Amino acid sequence: MFRRLLIATVVGILAAFAVAGFRHAMLLLEWLFLNNDSGSLVNAATNLSPWRRLLTPALGGLAAGLLLMGWQKFTQQRPHAPTDYMEALQTDGQFDYAASLVKSLASLLVVTSGSAIGREGAMILLAALAASCFAQRFTPRQEWKLWIACGAAAGMAAAYRAPLAGSLFIAEVLFGTMMLASLGPVIISAVVALLVSNLINHSDALLYNVQLSVTVQARDYALIISTGVLAGLCGPLLLTLMNACHRGFVSLKLAPPWQLALGGVIVGLLSLFTPAVWGNGYSTVQSFLTAPPLLMIIAGIFLCKLCAVLASSGSGAPGGVFTPTLFIGLAIGMLYGRSLGLWFPDGEEITLLLGLTEMATLLAATTHAPIMSTLMICEMTGEYQLLPGLLIACVIASVISRTLHRDSIYRQHTAQHS
């Protein structure tokens, strides 16, 4: 047992450095090509001329597509092993390391050029790759899947500063394939990754700064639970839209570079209306949480961002869909809150409260992982007073969503991009 805990610690350290490496590479490319040192792609887009704002995502998608197509032609074969940590966990615990690194580099290109796709997917993949490399060198074969799970959880903890949610995500996704006793090393890796990441970044701040002054009462619990029903209906709709957009891009029968470039062009066009469509949505989420906008502003940004996410994901842009889903949930919740706020004196607090809860419930509806979704929002915002209501709402959202749409967003996304 001591040996496993020691290896889990090493995996956590490796994962933290893998995530930090990708984050710093992203910041470097943003500084070189966008003259942006703020770390916010929305700020970068705001400061660009309209023609550069239009073309940059398209050129990034084109470059990523050429890289992926060139690698496939160079090797003259498809990857001989998984290039995704979810696939590796469901098979024999092995990666195609070279193809996975190329995929991560392609993700770096589309992320830094403004595509509305999550950077955290590549971060978690690199963390799992680092864990796999170490495991294949120093551990027996039957443990490889465990250490990949530890690496993925550690990567999620370092990326989102949510070690418990990262650990439980792995446990919920792999329920039935991992014994409960295996959860110990996963948690150790996640916590170590968070601590090392805090040391690297010289900060232990929460991912999102939220000032929620309301004390949750009976009325608020009823509203929170209602967001679970809303998310249970919206989650399957979002998954259906993503699947339809992917099929639409595939039906065009374009070469991968042109398909990714087309997705980038759509993002670029949308960014002419609002630069908030650039990136994974992190900075827009923070701005909404700091000062919830008016109803029409939320609606406008939401529609543009939703179309950008659908275009990026549908075109096959390598990256995650976790953080974009958080923004979509926040926007839906705030639209709901603004509508209800017309009848309540504390409309601002209700808007913020329902925005936070819809982030969790839509995440639960799309991932089918309600416990992870609850803890994720609590850990990212520090609003643990929401925990009881969120647990109920997330379970409701997950149950309704599973009834309407069998596959989770990860299973669907993996199938589309494998």
From Swiss-Prot:
InterPro entries for this protein: Cl-channel_core, Cl-channel_volt-gated_ClcB, ClC, ClC-type_chloride_channel
Cited CDD domains: Voltage_gated_ClC
Annotated TM spans: 5-25, 54-74, 146-166, 168-188, 222-242, 258-278, 291-311, 316-336, 352-372, 380-400
Keyword terms of this UniProt record: Cell inner membrane, Cell membrane, Chloride, Chloride channel, Ion channel, Ion transport, Membrane, Transmembrane, Transmembrane helix, Transport, Voltage-gated channel
Annotated Gene Ontology cellular component terms: chloride channel complex; plasma membrane
Locations listed in the record: Cell inner membrane
Domain of life: Bacteria
Positions in coiled-coil regions: none
Function: Probably acts as an electrical shunt for an outwardly-directed proton pump that is linked to amino acid decarboxylation, as part of the extreme acid resistance (XAR) response.
Protein name per its UniProtKB record: Voltage-gated ClC-type chloride channel ClcB
Gene: clcB
